[in-house]
Amino acid sequence: MGDRVILHSDINCCYASIEHLHHPELAGKPLAVGGDPEARHGIVLTADYIAKKYGVQTGMALWQAKQVCPDITFVSPRMDLYLRFSRMAHEIYAEYTDKQEPYGIDECWLDVTGSSSLKGDGLLIAQEISKRMKSELGITVSVGVSFNKIFAKLGSDYKKPDAITTMYKSEFKQKAWALPVSDLLYVGRSTNQKLAKFGIRTIGDLARADEGMLNSHLGKMGSILWSFANGYDESPVKLENTHAPIKSVGNSTTTPKDLVCDEDVKIVLYILAESVAARLRENGFRCRVVEISVRDNELFSFTRQKKIDHATNITGEIAAYAYQIFKENYNWSKPIRSIGVRGADLVTDNYWEQIDLFSSVEKREKQMKMDSAVDEIRRRFGFYSIQRGLMYRDRILSAVNAKEEHTVHPHGYFG
């Protein structure tokens, strides 16, 4: 069997590039998306390449960005607009393969192994996608072409903007091994610091390191990263549309900034619970188990679940259970990088269960009616037409429509 052909497409400075299309008067001028420009608070979600040359970085406070780039223009995020462009990009991708795995709004893996006989080899497909993104959407992409997902993403990061980089088996040692180990997917700041203590500064250093030593200091992440560096990633690109029976419904997200307190977590859990509950209702299911997954900023992760009293697809109930599970199981030893909510042990809407005389049937019926009304308002007028008051406490964390974006980040590497 021959090598797989995997692409990773990354929309360059996604939010900023789309805003430039809608603000032609800002052509050639530095621009950043994020926060509340009028109130001058919040952080930079993305900056264009002009602003980056001045030192503006994602996650930087707006006031800091203004200091390093006095002429910068800030615009508030418009997630509905960015999601529309993301969907249009995926429509282009779908003409080459149905094996698409989104990684956020702006990135996507494509398995085009079965498309080469009709569309040409991976490099040709990447060139065609790049050309079409420019001509049809007005934005540029960087595309990595490789035999696995890890090196395909490394290829898309290798050169920006508007570039195509191959990372074939015959060349990845020459191209990848000289790069800083921090360029490898899932090597965060803390892991990078640990590796540096052992003299591991490049991907090549990591590939040549003793796997047992890495395991002793990093746990199973040591073996995972060692295999990535050596090109042994065999993780599949997941089909975009799967018609297998639904056994659970979940969403997870890597947040735009680390979560550092209970309030941060509550906001994100409610966003994810809204998505899970809405998708349960759409498919005619309720869940009898609520599960959360948490990963800290050192990539240590855990999963906990709770059997609940009544099968539910009520947003508030799922969110409350998720938050209760979190409070009972996390001690805030480290900030949180990503979090997920899942409804499992599903039953259909017509499932009959014993009514507890002490439970508030009337209250639950009101909550169900409220959820149905919210579903209808959002269907007619858009996701952001109605929001919970909680979401206004942090507009950066609450700026994600988890249901529509449906960017369940790939956690399969971590079990």
Can you say where each PLM-predicted feature lies in the sequence?
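Gly/Gly-Pro- and Ser/Thr-rich, intrinsically disordered tail segments characteristic of DNA damage-repair
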Residues: 1-227, 237-240, 278, 364-415
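DNA-contacting surface of Y-family translesion DNA polymerases
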Residues: 8, 183, 191-336
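Short, charged/polar surface micro-motifs in flexible loops or helix N-caps
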Residues: 14, 37-40, 297-300, 346-349
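Short, hydrophobic beta-strand segments
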Residues: 108-114, 303-306, 353-359
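A glycine-rich phosphate-binding loop feature that marks nucleotide/adenosyl-phosphate handling sites
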Residues: 147-150, 230-231, 286-297, 336-347, ...
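C-terminal hydrophobic structural anchor segments
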Residues: 323-380
